[in-house]
C-alpha cells in the first residue's frame, strides 16, 4: 500500500502505534494521507470519518454524483430517488490500531460512507469473538500480533497444548512473553551466567535466541527484535498469513 490513512484511539497506546506506523510508511516511500484520532468507546464516528474524507478530497479522493435509486442500487440514504455524492477514496488502506469492539463499529460506518478499502490493525483485534461476530466489513482485514495461538508453528502448538492442559485456557500474549522470558533466563544460567548482569550480557551477545516467534536477538537498547505474526480475518476466522 502506497497511500494510507490512520484512524487511531486517542490513548497513549493508540498515539504511539499511529506514530510508529506513520514513520514506517514514510520510510517505505509511502504517503500518509490523513491521521485522525477518535475517542475510545464511542459508537458514532461520523465526525471522524468526515474529517478523513475532507482531508482526502484535498489530495486524491473524488466525489461524483450518481442516481440514488434504492431499487437499483440497494443503497438507502433517505430512501428517496434523486442524486447522491459517491465518494471514491484516494488511499489504499486504513490502519486502525484500536480495540476490537471499536474497530467493528468503525469498519461498518466506513463502509456506509463508501470507504471500502483494506483495513489494517494491531493486537487489539486479536479477541476470540471478533472474527466471528464482527460485521463483514472487516473481512480480509489484516493485523499484527506478537503471539498467535493458532499458528501452525510446532513450537507454538506445543506451548499452547501444554498451557491449555495446565490452565484450561488459551495462552495470551502476556503468557507467551512470560514463557519466553523464563526460558531465556534458564538458557543463560545453563550457559554459565550466575548474576543478573551475567544473564544480561549473555542475552545481548546472542542473535538466535529461541522464542515462540522464532530466532530472536536484542538490540543495543535492550529491545527484543522478534518476528510478529500477521493474521487475516477470513470467513469468520483468524488465518495466519505466514
Q: Locations of the language-model features?
A:
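Extracytosolic ligand-binding ectodomains
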Residues: 1-242
